[in-house]
Amino acid sequence: MNDVSMDKQRYLIKASGVAAALFAGIAENGFSASYFSYALAAFLLFLFYDLYMSRPIDRSFLPDVRSAKWLFTGIVIFYGVLLISAFLHGTKGSVNTVLWQFNLTIPFFLMLFWRARYDIDKGFLCGMAAGALVNCIWAFVQFHADPNVPAMAGYAQQNHLGTGINLMWPFVLYMMYSTQDTKKKVMWAVLLVLMAGALYTSKSRGAGLALSGGLILTGITLIAALRGKFNLGLIFKGLAVIALVTAVCAGGFLYLSHDKKTGLDPERVGGERLMMLEASWEMWNDHKLTGVGPGKWGEYYYSPKYHPKDGHEKGHTMPHDMPMLFLTEDGIFGVAAYFAFLLLTYGYLYRAIRTSQNKALASAMMLSFLIFTLHGLVDTTIINKIPGRMYYMILGWYAGYIAYESYRQRRLI
């Protein structure tokens, strides 16, 4: 998208693919406390190389990303309302909480700029696949060491591993679908099986439920967006895949519930989650407009006024439910901003399914978004360090893809 010479352009494209692979692969694995710094280093090294090779810099260095305006609007509304809530509470801790949460969106803006400027798809997707493989191996090693302890790989908690795997499923499936090379299809299929195994080692029931629910909602979305464009055979294949995955996830949920000796009793299946939701509702009833304050849920939950009499679990900082967290901490305006963000993202991806030339990739992004959103109903997602950054990284990359596609279409007119 810039006016550098053809030779320089070829070097830049190759370098961008390698750097994107490193960025994606590193960003998926919390192998150290400063893991994301290494991912940023890969981006910055390429950026400096790009600046050097693109001299003299002109306006084309900054790509046209107007196609992502719905996503920009959603981010501004969501985090803007959270920040206003923090200022209204007047505590430094609340402001720092929101700023830290907004910090997780950095990969979105980096990848949007990067992908809108260069075609990094091959490198980025291969980096994601490599990161997924590392997560699988890491999880299997932990499971082998002690099968009774849920695997976490490099994540802070087993449910985060489930979230990370779920974010990557759709794109590994997309790569298997899009290639015509039989050997590559087998390779991607093997990776899918390994990811299924890693998901099992995490023992994350919420991840399984989110996966099956995401498939069902994505199927409904595709039928609505592409009505009249499906052939009967494709519909039956899609229904078969959804039915199979749903059956496997339901079986896994029942097995893990039995393994954890909770059964399907709603009072036990989620630990203290039901108590947390009830306590959160009481908190909101007492603080309807502005909530208890960002980052203050744990403080209020363990206070004598709101802590359940039968509660015994320690160290919780959220109710394992994203809408309820924002309702409790930020009031009615906070949860409204969260839903506005989700609706704008869904609308953006729905439009992409209808208008993009690559509908398979648009469907993969929609599936990843819906799985991530549904998982947020039973656990934390968008406020967690590694899963949150992964989600924004993938969303930013896809938004850059759409921006680049829009740019090329305008040039053909």
Regions found by a protein language model. Give the residues of each.
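Transmembrane signal-anchor hairpin modules in multi-pass inner-membrane enzymes, especially those
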Residues: 1-84, 106, 113-129, 175-186, ...
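Membrane-interface helix caps and helix-loop-helix hairpins in membrane proteins
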Residues: 30-31, 87-96, 148-154, 200-205, ...
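A membrane-periplasm/extracellular boundary helix in multi-pass inner-membrane enzymes
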Residues: 201, 219-269, 278-286, 294
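Long extracytoplasmic/lumenal interhelical loops at the membrane interface
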Residues: 266-275, 290-330
